[in-house]
Design a protein with these regions (language model features):
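Structured-RNA-binding interfaces characteristic of tRNA pseudouridine synthases
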Residues: 1-251
Length: 251
């Protein structure tokens, strides 16, 4: 059996997240259906993470096993026809037999985008969080940096998925501005349910003067979700970078 890794990108607006659902469309199920047609057998994808409903991915890796002999360079083009245009396979690669998209991932980066303007932009609907009041990116960046390091992140997660530990290491958490678009980029060895969206909501609270960067370590220590900011909408969230030992998967 071949072990094949796929480098994907997708617009998550029409999907109820990555993971298969009983009644809702998911990215995993949709792509599996197309791959099964191309490979001539049923395939099962393993994804690098469970993006939620409405969340996008500029970079995403999934792998599957197949006995199909389709040439690896033809696979991305072959799967285009049976797959909707909001899911794209950028590249397919033969990988080691023990490779697993989620288990082999070293760290991930998510980006949350905020459209900060008095007037809405239709091209950012479901692709960035519209926030009409002027935001100070320096205040937001200071608050974001307070999340860096190894902490218990219970205070910025939603109850949902069970996990052995809520301790994670955030390698960087920064806010930058490009015109009217603000971006919060956070890289960690793993993420809790809704963690990035809750961090973003807390950083927005700092910009609104509801808390300060100095309050954030105390909020994390408390483990109290009610002390942090709200969980912002999913449309502004993107998976944007991944790291693997197999460097072919890192671009």
């Amino acid at each position: 059996m071949r072990n094949i890794a796929l480098k994907l990108m997708y617009n998550g607006t029409a999907y109820h997240g990555w993971q298969m659902q009983r009644t809702e469309a998911s990215v995993q199920e949709t792509l599996q259906r197309g791959l099964s047609m191309v490979c001539g057998e049923r395939v099962r994808l393993t994804g690098v993470g469970r993006t939620d409903a409405g969340v996008h991915a500029e970079r995403y890796v999934a792998n599957f096993r197949t006995s199909s002999r389709i040439p690896i360079d033809r696979l991305p083009f072959a799967v285009t026809t049976p797959t909707p245009e909001d899911i794209v396979v950028r590249e397919a690669l033969e990988v080691a037999d023990d490779f697993n998209a989620i288990g082999s991932c070293l760290k991930k980066e998510y980006t949350y985008r905020i459209y900060n303007s008095r007037i809405k932009n239709p091209f950012y609907v479901n692709r960035a969080y519209f926030y009409p009041k002027k935001l100070d990116e320096a205040v937001m960046d200071a608050a974001a940096r307070a999340f860096e390091g190894t902490h218990d992140f219970r205070a910025v997660r939603s109850v949902g998925t069970e996990t052995k530990t809520t301790v994670r290491t955030v390698h960087y958490c920064r806010v930058t501005r490009r015109g009217e678009l603000l971006e919060l980029k956070v890289c960690a060895d793993g993420f809790l349910y809704n963690m990035v969206r809750a961090i973003t909501g807390t950083v927005l609270y700092a910009a609104e003067g509801k808390l300060t960067a100095e309050d954030i370590p105390k909020i994390l220590d408390s483990g109290d979700r009610t002390l942090a900011g709200p969980t912002v909408p999913p449309g502004g969230l993107y998976m944007t970078r991944l790291w693997y030992e197999d460097e072919r998967l890192n671009d």
